[in-house]
Amino acid sequence: MVKSSLQRILNSHCFAREKEGDKRSATLHASRTMPLLSQHSRGGCSSESSRVALHCCSNLGPGPRWCSDVPHPPLKIPGGRGNSQRDHSLSASILYSDERLNVTEEPTSNDKTRVLSIQCTLTEAKQVTWRAVWNGGGLYIELPAGPLPEGSKDSFAALLEFAEEQLRADHVFICFPKNREDRAALLRTFSFLGFEIVRPGHPLVPKRPDACFMVYTLEREDPGEED
């Protein structure tokens, strides 16, 4: 089960790297995301004076390169890099909320693909947000470029629990560029957690020759087997 693996992700050497360097470096890495999963979207990082929000993923949307052939809905990206007139934060609806997680869903024209923003509150002054695509029983997450920012370990653990317990997901996919300098370290870390490399041509991932995909299969216990 995923809970039995979460402690290992907190202590893995990849996530330990987030403590190295200063806060300025962590913020820089949080905003440098890999090329988009949708051909029509762009990612970004935003912050507020009273709260730090680390957006740890590109603005993923239901597009032809990410498990859907429906055009990505127009977005106004925080930081002024969007060219649309609609701000996704204004039209998003709350899907799930507790004392730590706040998950919102952005409207799309495809009822089979859902764009989620999973915000984890670490402290009163810091939040980490993962943007993901929920499609066909799988949750798809794109790792940010560079070392994962401070706080990503705890937020990622909470995300995996949410995928298992609330979404009842069958798989959680991660992806990152094949040419990353820390590719070997990421492969070791996530393999240790139970993730497996997705081979080219897998029916559940888009054709991205520039990206490496890994998958974690969520296996739920049969209630009758607990005794």
Curated annotation (Swiss-Prot):
Gene Ontology terms, MF aspect: enzyme binding; ornithine decarboxylase inhibitor activity; protein-containing complex binding
InterPro entries, alphabetized: Acyl_CoA_acyltransferase, ODC_AZ, ODC_AZ_sf
Protein purpose: Ornithine decarboxylase (ODC) antizyme protein that negatively regulates ODC activity and intracellular polyamine biosynthesis and uptake in response to increased intracellular polyamine levels. Binds to ODC monomers, inhibiting the assembly of the functional ODC homodimer, and targets the monomers for ubiquitin-independent proteolytic destruction by the 26S proteasome. Triggers ODC degradation by inducing the exposure of a cryptic proteasome-interacting surface of ODC. Stabilizes AZIN2 by interfering with its ubiquitination.
A Pfam family assignment: ODC_AZ
Keyword Transferase: no
Transmembrane domains' residue ranges: none
Entries under SUPFAM superfamilies matching the protein: Acyl-CoA N-acyltransferases (Nat) (SSF55729)
Name of encoding gene: Oaz1
Assembly, per entry: Interacts with ODC1 and thereby sterically blocks ODC homodimerization. Forms a ternary complex with PSMB4 and OAZ1 before PSMB4 is incorporated into the 20S proteasome. Interacts with AZIN2; this interaction disrupts the interaction between the antizyme and ODC1. Interacts with FAM171A1.
Induction entry: Induced by a ribosomal frameshifting mechanism in response to increased levels of intracellular polyamines.
GO cellular component: cytoplasm; nucleus
Protein origin, superkingdom: Eukaryota
Name recorded for this polypeptide: Ornithine decarboxylase antizyme 1
GO annotation (BP), single: positive regulation of protein catabolic process
Family membership: Belongs to the ODC antizyme family.
Keyword list, A-Z: Polyamine biosynthesis, Transport
Keyword Glycosyltransferase: no
